[in-house]
Amino acid sequence: MRTLPHKLFAVTAILAIFPIIGPGSAAQTTKKKPKYNVLFISSDDLRPELGAYGLKDIKTPNVDKIASRGMRFDRAYAQYPVCNPSRASLLTGRYPTETKVMNNNDYFRRIDPSTVTLPQHFKNNGYVSLRSGKIFHGGIDDQVSWTEGGEPTDPNITERGNPNFRPTKPANSDPAQAQAQTAGVNIADSNSDRIVVLDGDGENHGDYRTATRAINFIEKYKDRPFFLAVGFVKPHSPPTAPKKFFDLYDVKKIPLPVDFGATPKALAGAPEISISPRNSDLFIGRESTPELSREMKRAYWASTSFMDAQVGRVIDSLEKNGLKDNTIIVFFGDHGYHLGEKGKWSKAYSLYELGLRVPLLIAMPNQKARSTTRIVELVDLYPTLADLCGLPKPTNISGDSLAPLLKNPNAAWDRPAYSVTQYRQSLGRSIRTSRWHYVEWDEGKSGAMLYATEKDPHELKNLSSDPKYAKTIAEMKQLLAKMPVIP
């Protein structure tokens, strides 16, 4: 359990969830609680900008379908704004300062071989644990966690080896045509900073094959309780999709952010360290003009819609095999992403709202569409799924079950979200409450930020140096002091 104060107890969480999951509570029957399957879907670099989140211009009908029968978490946060540390955290139920995974190359089990991961916990309790696509990280996986699918991640799926990006080429397309689709960037210059238009339906792309493998797993194990993790790479750079998904969007109608910049730069009043001066994914070493930025954002949206189509193929298979009513579906992004805000086209090192906030949906069988504005964290997924499926409570984890919020979106919940990043040998820490977002680097020695998030959702005005907010900053520091630190 986390050390932050709260009034939730394990008994409350367990009892509260039974009405959601239908008949079969201990008070009503002596039948053994059924083992629900878990379909655990992740998307890389995905912002909470989906139809289900109110952005109707972005076409994501299949993810929206998950939301239509589940809980939408409007304020869910990653614990680290980079893939490997974030995934290691949520899959172990521990904060990055506990896993000590603070970059894209560390492997959590080298640090703590005794760790029991989320899929491993299900595997140890009678489930078949299955992996398709990118779940832990490209080039880094954890074979002991899986019954099947634990082989090293295919770089053709993840588009990333370790530590360098691998080339991604449009399937069976003419090189000259592909070159014309790179928003002015030579393909040879960067495997990440380009736009890729696929032929056909994208059958040869890694995400399409990830969905196909997941479908095969569903058909193979439909008669056994399973934990199936499906990791889609898109919309991670390079933004990639078949042409029909680009055609969904009129580039002239794509908006630019209020704090758009040609190059990455912290706004006046914010510490320089808060924004890396060089993009690491898109617009690397070059300016992002409004015209090129709209083209890139269109490609990101097209890539999101392509990923959504693959989600639909997996959901359709679940329903085709009669598993809709006994499967919990989780859909989430692994961290946030900047699309030109403050000139940044990446997520790396960003402790801003955009770097940390993620989409999170949890659909229980027979549940209606609802939403909650309570602050939650990805580190909560491990204890939540163990709770919902009646597994023994995992030990040595820091997350808390979200079962009470699935029962009542307005349940008492006084938990903030804690996130960290390491940049230039400096440790940045973030605490997010319902009203405030506070960030400090090296305990404030290298800078700090305080934003009144309701009044300033774009985080334009840093209040950390205003003496009127000294009491608020002291309270935020007290919350940070209760969180794990690196020994």
For every predicted segment, state its role:
Residues 1-12:
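Bacterial N-terminal signal peptides that target proteins for export
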Residues 12-15, 23-442, 446-449, 457-485:
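Formylglycine-dependent sulfatase
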